């Protein structure tokens, strides 16, 4: 399926860093070799974190990484969770979120800084009850592993905001499973 849209190269640069940390530079070469086997000319070399890249290439690379190393969909959760730790852009974003209400208000704008696909908005934010629901609409139906990446990324960002490791994030609705949209439910 061809996905129309763009995503910042940050996803690829942090994925490359993750592969190097877990599998060394040889791991990156294995992924690039697999990509060439399917007749694609992608290379991690020269990828810029701030440039826009076709979303279908980024999704393809993320899925091929799982295949090359025999990793499960849940591994993408771990990758997404570790990305904000290594990303200067994510660290700057976290500094801009001075409180949960500000984070809730500015999430849609930050989503736009990363991709032109879909819309991300909070549909429930109850700080007293310690729960929130984030909805992703108009995002293409892609492999569940991509949503696991989002879940990991969102968990790490939210943990940093609430300064708690007791946070749970679940995908409670998923376009991948036939729902109209994807929702991430947070409880802490």
Descriptions of predicted regions:
Residues 49-149, 166-167, 173:
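Amphipathic interaction/junction segments at domain boundaries or subunit interfaces
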Residues 1-89:
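N-terminal low-complexity or simple alpha-helical regulatory segments
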Residues 148-162:
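Short, non-transmembrane amphipathic alpha-helical segments
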Residues 167-188:
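Beta-rich nucleic-acid/ligand-interaction surfaces
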């Amino acid at each position: 399926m061809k996905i129309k849209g763009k995503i910042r190269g940050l996803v690829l640069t942090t994925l490359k860093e993750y592969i190097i940390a877990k599998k060394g530079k040889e791991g990156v070469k294995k992924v690039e070799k697999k990509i060439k086997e399917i007749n694609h000319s992608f290379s991690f070399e020269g990828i810029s974190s701030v440039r826009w890249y076709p979303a279908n290439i980024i999704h393809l690379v993320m899925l091929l990484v799982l295949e090359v190393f025999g990793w499960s969909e849940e591994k993408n959760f771990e990758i997404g969770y570790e990305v904000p730790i290594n990303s200067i852009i994510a660290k700057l974003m976290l500094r801009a979120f001075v409180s949960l209400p500000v984070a809730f208000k500015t999430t849609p704008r930050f989503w736009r800084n990363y991709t032109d696909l879909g819309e991300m908005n909070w549909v429930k934010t109850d700080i007293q009850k310690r729960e929130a629901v984030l909805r992703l609409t108009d995002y293409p139906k892609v492999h569940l592993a991509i949503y696991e990446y989002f879940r990991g990324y969102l968990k790490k960002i939210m943990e940093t905001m609430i300064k708690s490791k007791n946070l749970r994030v679940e995908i409670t609705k998923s376009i991948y499973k036939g729902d109209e949209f994807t929702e991430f439910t947070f409880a802490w």
